């Protein structure tokens, strides 16, 4: 079925089992079943966690942050804690160092650390590899006895990515990586981080969810992602609401009419409002046991991302078109867009046929072979707890 994503090992000097280390954190990547580009609009999302990244961490009293990644062919990087500042680092180290900056900015007096990272989350695949790189605060939380809860760590990681790295991402990735449970999808209200764990055991129902990494890379900080976010904020301002999640689905036509000739903004608003409704529809279908019917909702979601939000690409469209022609139950792109991955819902018996059809289509188009693997919902870095929409966020580490 193509390549598998396994559990990484923080081997060598950073081994999680080594006596010299004093902490080990685990954080997951994620796939998002439905709810794309809704998190920074205070809407609903529904991610599940993928296999973990591992970080081995030890505390240093010297104010030096020493970073090493098993996935980067380079010597360890040493940074002075006092020199950490937004826009000071544009390499992969910006993600873990940004979290230390955010923790210190929030008033937590930390010294330094040795950090060794290992990951199987593909970079640029739309699977939250950046959030996985922020694994270290989970171990730091224990090492320094900070007593921060999962949702607080998620907020700090988001601030690190927004301010320190310069990527205008929402809160979904960080919360999913921290709070997802095995065998479940996380129904998350990104406005207040209230959440509900929805059972999502496809194997028990004779189905599988495949992730197809097109190997086309993207970068959120290169402009297009930010343009969409700015357009959504403009739409909310024109409609007189705090965020687009405040536009009821039943009032969408009236809202679009109020936007007049702002065609680009109209498209963005239409996607966000209809996507929120799609998330709620998928939740209802899963809770009623109508799991196969979510495939049609995934198809709708891809059309909206392609035609209204305009963040798909030829490689992603090739995956979804080929999969649907090969008897897939549903498919759509996932992640920030402009490359990355698609998810494909299939009957278990059709996994090999659909995988081969996609691989053959890429070969015929002269493209690099896609990376195909099964998405089995895993536990993230911390268990999630069910809370009501009006209650306080409740994912505890």
UniProtKB/Swiss-Prot annotation:
One term under GO cellular component: cytosol
Catalysis performed (reactions): alpha-D-galactose + ATP = alpha-D-galactose 1-phosphate + ADP + H(+)
InterPro entries: Galactokinase, Galactokinase_bac, Galactokinase_CS, GalKase_N, GHMP_kinase_C_dom, GHMP_kinase_C_sf, GHMP_kinase_N_dom, GHMP_knse_ATP-bd_CS
GO biological process terms, semicolon-separated: galactose metabolic process
Region (Disordered): 1-27
Gene3D superfamilies registered for this protein in UniProt: 3.30.230.10, GHMP kinase, C-terminal domain (3.30.70.890)
Main localisation: cytoplasm
Low complexity bias spans: 9-18
Binding site residues for substrate: 36-39, 225
Keyword terms: ATP-binding, Carbohydrate metabolism, Cytoplasm, Galactose metabolism, Kinase, Magnesium, Metal-binding, Nucleotide-binding, Transferase
EC number: 2.7.1.6
Site (Transition state stabilizer) residue list: 30
Origin superkingdom: Bacteria
Subcellular location: Cytoplasm
Residues binding ATP: 69, 124-130
Positions annotated as active site in the UniProt record: 173 (proton acceptor)
PROSITE patterns: GALACTOKINASE, GHMP_KINASES_ATP
Gene Ontology molecular function: any one: galactokinase activity
Binding locations of Mg(2+): 130, 161
Pathway(s) it belongs to: Carbohydrate metabolism; galactose metabolism
Class of this enzyme: transferase
Family: Belongs to the GHMP kinase family. GalK subfamily.
Job of this protein: Catalyzes the transfer of the gamma-phosphate of ATP to D-galactose to form alpha-D-galactose-1-phosphate (Gal-1-P).
Protein name as annotated: Galactokinase
Native source organism of the sequence: Streptomyces lividans
Gene from which this protein is expressed: galK
């Amino acid at each position: 079925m193509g390549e598998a994503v396994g559990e990484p090992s923080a081997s060598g000097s950073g081994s999680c089992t080594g006596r010299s280390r004093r902490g080990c954190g685990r954080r997951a990547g994620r796939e998002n079943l439905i709810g794309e580009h809704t998190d920074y609009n205070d809407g609903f999302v529904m991610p599940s966690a993928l296999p973990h990244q591992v970080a081995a961490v030890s505390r240093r009293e010297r104010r030096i942050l020493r970073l090493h990644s098993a996935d980067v062919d380079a010597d360890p990087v040493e940074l002075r804690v006092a020199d950490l500042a937004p826009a000071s680092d544009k390499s992969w180290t910006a993600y873990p160092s940004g979290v230390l900056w955010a923790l210190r900015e929030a008033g937590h007096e930390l010294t330094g650390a040795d950090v060794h990272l290992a990951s199987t989350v593909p970079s640029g695949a739309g699977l939250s590899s950046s959030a996985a790189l922020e694994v270290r605060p989970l171990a730091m939380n224990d090492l320094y006895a900070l007593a921060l809860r999962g949702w607080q760590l998620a907020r700090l990681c988001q601030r690190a990515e927004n301010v320190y790295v310069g990527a205008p991402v929402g809160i979904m990735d960080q919360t999913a990586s921290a709070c997802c449970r095995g065998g479940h999808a996380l129904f998350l209200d990104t406005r207040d981080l209230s959440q509900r764990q929805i059972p999502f055991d496809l194997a028990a129902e004779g189905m599988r969810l495949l992730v197809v990494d097109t190997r086309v890379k993207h970068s959120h900080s290169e402009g297009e992602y930010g343009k969409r976010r700015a357009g959504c904020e403009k739409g909310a301002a024109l409609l007189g609401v705090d965020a687009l999640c405040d536009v009821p689905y039943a009032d969408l036509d009236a809202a679009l009419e109020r936007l007049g000739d702002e065609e680009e903004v109209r498209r963005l608003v239409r996607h966000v409002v209809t996507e929120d409704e799609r998330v709620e529809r998928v939740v209802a279908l899963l809770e009623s046991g109508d799991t196969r019917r979510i495939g049609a909702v995934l198809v709708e979601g891809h059309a909206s991302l392609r035609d209204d939000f305009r963040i798909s690409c030829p490689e992603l469209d090739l995956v979804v078109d080929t999969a649907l022609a090969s008897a897939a139950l549903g498919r759509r792109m996932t992640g920030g867009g402009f490359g990355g991955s698609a998810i494909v819902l299939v009957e278990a018996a059709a996994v090999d046929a659909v995988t081969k059809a996609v691989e053959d289509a890429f070969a015929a188009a002269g493209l690099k072979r896609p990376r195909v693997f099964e998405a089995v919902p895993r536990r993230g870095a911390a268990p999630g707890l069910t809370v009501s929409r009006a209650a306080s966020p409740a994912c505890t580490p």
